[in-house]
Amino acid sequence: MKNQKKLIILTGPSGVGKGTVIKEILGKDKNIWLSISATTREPREGEQEGENYYFLKQEKFKEMIEKNLFLEWAQFAGNYYGTPLSSVNEKITKGFTVLLEIEVEGAKQIKEKFPESLSIFLLPPDKAELERRIRNRGTEKEEAIKKRLLRASYEISASNQFDFELTNHNVDETAKRIIKLIQT
């Protein structure tokens, strides 16, 4: 893939506010395109096919893995997630900066394959705030929440493996800081 500096990786634990920060970034800079990931998980309320995710059956996802059609892929919380390669290449070729919102293992894969990409790890203000955000979604049962919190502790311990660590205290400020990092 040419022009790796146009590839931006945003990662962090579930509930840290990646999606909210990204909405703010996209509203401020029209030259940044958000890559749409594929997943085998069920859509959450309000999520649209092709807008939030490409929702795939597990068989289709595995077929795409076998054909090397993902930039990266990983299994998380019992579901598969991946970044379709074709759309990323197309947008970079057209001159866009491509922003990838992906989980930590996928982010590590991309950083290894594309070392010139910019990787940013988004941190919560603290663990209590992270738990509050996950619970306030109201979309998951207690067992799933506990899994996400356990996974978050592991992921946060890997935050120093990325180019930048940013704590998401304020969405607007975090978005501005990320745009500044992209532009430098």
Curated annotation (Swiss-Prot):
Q: Which InterPro entries does this UniProt record tie to the protein?
A: GK/Ca_channel_bsu, Guanylate_kin-like_dom, Guanylate_kinase, Guanylate_kinase_CS, P-loop_NTPase
Specify the protein name. Answer: Guanylate kinase
Q: Where does ATP bind?
A: 12-19
Domain of life per record: Bacteria
Q: Does the keyword Transmembrane apply?
A: no
| NCBIfam families cross-referenced by the UniProt entry | guanyl_kin
Which UniProt keyword terms apply here? ATP-binding, Cytoplasm, Kinase, Nucleotide-binding, Transferase
Known EC number = 2.7.4.8
Q: Which GO terms describe its cellular component?
A: cytosol
Residues in Guanylate kinase-like domain copies: 5-183
Q: What Pfam families does the record point to?
A: Guanylate_kin
Q: What function does the entry list? A: Essential for recycling GMP and indirectly, cGMP.
Q: Which organism is it from?
A: Prochlorococcus marinus (strain MIT 9312)
Where's it found, cell-wise? Answer: Cytoplasm
Q: What family classification does the UniProt entry report for this protein?
A: Belongs to the guanylate kinase family.
Q: Name one GO molecular function term.
A: ATP binding
> What does it catalyze?
GMP + ATP = GDP + ADP
Looking up SUPFAM superfamilies in the UniProt record yields: P-loop containing nucleoside triphosphate hydrolases
Q: Which SMART domains match?
A: GuKc
